[in-house]
Amino acid sequence: MKNLLLYLLSFFIVLPLVAQKASPPNDNAFNTVNYRSIAPLRINGEQGVSAPFVGTIGKSVLVAGGCNFPTTPAAQGGKKQFYADIYELTNIDDDTQQWHKIAQLPQPLAYGVSVSVPHGMVCVGGTGDGQTSSARVYLLHTDRQSHLLVDELPSLPLALDNMAGAYGGGYIYVAGGLSNGKAVNAAFRMRYPHGKEWERLPDFPGAARVQPAAAVQNNATSSCFYLVGGFAPIDGDQPAVAHTDGYYYNAAARQWIKIADIVPHGRSEAMTLAGAYGISSGCAHIVFVGGVNKQRFERAVNMPLLLKKAEFTAKKYHTQAAIQALESLKAEQAAYLFHPEEWYQFNDELVIYHTITNTWVTESQSPLLARAGTGIVKCGNEWVVVNGETKPGIRSSAVTAIKMTMRPTFGWLNWTVLIAYLVGMVLLGYYFMRRGGDADDFFKGGGRIPWWAAGISIYATMLSAITYMAYPAKAYATDWTYYPMLVTILIVSFPVIKYYLPFFRRLNVTSAYEYLERRFNATTRLMASALFIIFMVARMALVLYLPSLALTAVTGIDLYICIVLMALVTIVYCTMGGVEAVVWGDVVQGFILVGGALFAVGYLIWGTEGGFEGFCQIVMDDNKLRLFNWSFDYRSATFWVIILGGMANNLISYTSDQTVIQRYLTTKDEAGARRSILLNGVMSVFVSIAFFAIGAGLYTFFKTHPAELDFTMAKADTIFPFFMMSQLPPGIAGLLIAAIFAATMSTISSNINSVATAFSVDFYKRFRPSATDKATLTVARRTCIVSGVLGMGIALLMATWDILSLLDFFQEILGLLSSGLGGLFLMGIFCPRIGGRAALIGFVCGVAAVFLTRYLTDTSFLLYGFIGMFSSIIVGLICSCFIRESKSLAGLCWRERI
């Protein structure tokens, strides 16, 4: 056994020494952008339209309205025509498909907002003559026979055109624009599909914005509405200004918050996004397409003001210079519409904003992008850009599909490390299987596990992949406010050692829930054990999902294949070796976890521009090391919520979780169990600093290298694995990915083994007391397989859900499913007057209270555990006043302990 451990540890320690030295960070080499032309859309001649409504219904792309100059060009004084026609392209992948006119809007419209929604496409506002704004809102959708229908939705409170808008988070947003020719700062939103009216939001700060760009995207904590660019028209003697800044609307605080100016990384000059369109990409990026050149545009729109001033100067002074200046301006104005397209310098790059690091970059360049007033919509895995103008007055008929993909490069050395690790874990399970043993060996390791190994195993089990991916991702996106929750693990260790451990050790139970039957009744035991099994299967699914995200991010292998592969390897090695294989596997994995984390911290700080000094400057400027939020808001992660929730949730885990309690029983004596609990608490406090430091390091690294982010990253929790793959030397990256797998396997294997213990002891042995050890062991191994497969199935389902933070999701599941268990053990040990029936009623009411809190209030999920425990104890105490039970409690509660 020692030789096997030495081999595994030596392999992972020596490997970094032979890994290649990392090259300096380069620009993003993993995202590729492809452009292709699809069927052109021509309306009334050979040209397309500008400012149309664009959306999708199913796989079809719809284009409605728009405007152009059909007969006489704008340069020759032509009149702009507005349209009501609706065109459809049924399949963008079929080169033979053409656009077909299928219906009409109730009125000609352009310069409004269009968004694709689950039931169709919504068209908001606009103008039909360039003067009068519309407040009407239309829903385009199909009936069962696929016929297009146009229904009217609640009208805007204020008629608008030339505004921006987006759909996300269950709301349609619009902001800015003109209201019958007057620029406004107004913003509105309407819940869709159940909204009955538009909600007026606070006006956005600063000057008005005409033709801004907008998108809905996640920031660190929630879905937000982003509004950037646009221009403020001439206001009296104040010149027009093309904006180079932007804001996002924070719905929780009901306020607009400024974002960084549009200065792409590596450049010094700000851009504008007037006439551009935005669309979300991945979990935290917004891609902006098209738009005008700031200098050219401001010069053109301010020409009337410049002419007015020049005429005043020429009339007042009658100098030759003043007259020549006036004539020069007139000539410039007359020539403005006659320049070639290149002269206008419309934006021909993808301008990309990252909501977490608050940075701008540009990516790719194509003449197909150099348009203003286009329409853009996501169709499948591509963005479709429709028409627009290539210069003032000239409409393009082009329709372009843009596809941005991420191509990971994992490399043979990384694969070698990862495969070697997985093989090593299977061999570890095989080693313990050959040693044989009875059911006591399978469930409790024969009581021969050293205290330090049990302590490391508890640590690896409780934190695991959530520590390695979710905590760094949380610190990267927010700050260190979750860290005090880990400190509460050490705080909770002391009451666990004093009040709980003696009961589990002296009663010599295999399943923690045996105690509940002795203290209360069989029904309580069975219900608690069943709820624990449900929670463990859910936890298995979540923890299985995390590394699968990592493997998908770094290798490109399909997420579902990764989930199945990860589940099968873990089930095999856990089923073979029992808890002893699990614990010694956790020891190996614990070393990899800690060593890999410390290496990553150093590498991230070294890779940040400015090194350690640059790292410190950024985290201080952006408040990334904030530990405490002293607000009394019970809806967010304030200090009080973190401490109260952390104490409750960790008390639940360390007093009612069979996975942890089983470790208490694997040591040779109670003193060893005490030391293992304290070791876990100390590791949780000090080692976890490294994982939060990783999050801060990821933030500083990518803030100084924003072009190296994956612009299509679908899950924020994959930021650390992406860094490993994209920045670390070959071999080192494989080692840290192996650490994520180590974290996962430690948790899942412990969960599987604990589920097998709970089912075999609490159900099988309970109803088959005469069953032999061999039969019990067979049932346990079969339970391992069944529970692992169930966890795998739920993980596959989870892959289809939109989860912003897996850490938050785990804490919510913990509170919902486990709070009642913690309440039962509290009642059993500290409330001798509560009998079995009162405890059962309290347990059920505690679980109900948590679910009611979840669905009827905005209370932070971190408080669910506290609410469940507190409710169950209060109800249990009240019921005990009316339900009296006589039962010997000798050795079963603290007052009657032996």
Residue map of PLM features:
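Residue-level detector of intrinsically disordered/flexible regions characterized by low predicted structural confidence
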Residues: L4-L5, A22-S23, Q211-A213, I259-A260, ...
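Membrane-embedded helix-loop-helix hairpins and adjacent transmembrane boundary segments
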Residues: R407-I898
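Intrinsically disordered, low-complexity serine/threonine-rich segments
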Residues: I13-V14, G275, E341, G891
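Short amphipathic alpha-helical segments
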Residues: K2, A51-P52, A84, D440, ...
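Positively charged n-region of N-terminal signal peptides that target proteins for export
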Residues: M1-L4, R833
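Kelch-like beta-propeller repeat domains
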Residues: K21-T409
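Bacterial N-terminal signal peptides
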Residues: Y7-P16
